Amino acid sequence: RQRQMCIRDSNRYYKKGEHNMIPVYAISTGKIETLNYDQKRPMHSALNKTMFSGKMWLSYTGFSEDEQAYKDHGGPHKAVCCFSKENYSMYKNDINILPDYAMFGENLTLVDLDENDVYFGNQYQLGEAIVEVSEIREPCWKIQRKYGIKHLVKRMSSSGKTGFYMRVLKEGYVQQQDHLLLLKTAEFPTRLSVQNLNDIYYNDRENIDRLNQAINNPYLSPKRIEKLKLLKEKAMNK
């Protein structure tokens, strides 16, 4: 109830496009545990996250009480995982009762922030910390296993509604009532949205012009640039 009141207040005072405030519905962390969604093949994951109380330290590698079972899910360029609560509705016909927050193991469940409106290099204040959009999210088979939705990973990837990651530029404490305050928007010459990169990476892998646009973005992680260069090389050799 307290979180819902906070969100109502944030929607009232920080309407979309006003004050550069992006309401956060929940901030969540999780520990690695054994999950038995498939009795034949238990999996180790920190997918099931819960909201924390009080304040928590956000370091260059993520929240102090958050863990990742797979090394590629974390690191300095994937310190904070974000997902829009608005996109939960894409799966309302697949799941009887949609989770209230952290449906896909994200740290920040945003009230409504479309991937078309999120650019790599955007910087936000979150509590005492400053974060920057740095990576797309590549949906993992574990979320498909959890919900038992056929082709969930493919559906999410092709839609472009994957959520995204942020790196931490300034460490600091974060509390549940904190929201994202836009400090800087990526520059026009190299502006690239999460939706655009998802479309390139998942749906348009042989478009060399678009691949070049993405490769030249100064804010993407080195690993993402490597993957894009490999796609370009394959496209040119076809």
Label every PLM stretch briefly.
Residues 143-161, 165:
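Double-stranded beta-helix
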Residues 121, 171, 175-178:
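Loop/turn positions that initiate beta-strands
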Residues 1-7:
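Short, small-residue-biased leader/transition segments that mark boundaries at the very start
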Residues 179-184:
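Short hydrophobic beta/alpha edge segments that flank linear recognition/processing sites
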Residues 13-145, 151, 186-238:
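Electropositive, beta-rich accessory/interaction domains or terminal extensions
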Residues 110, 163-170:
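Short alpha-helix capping/helix-loop boundary micro-motifs
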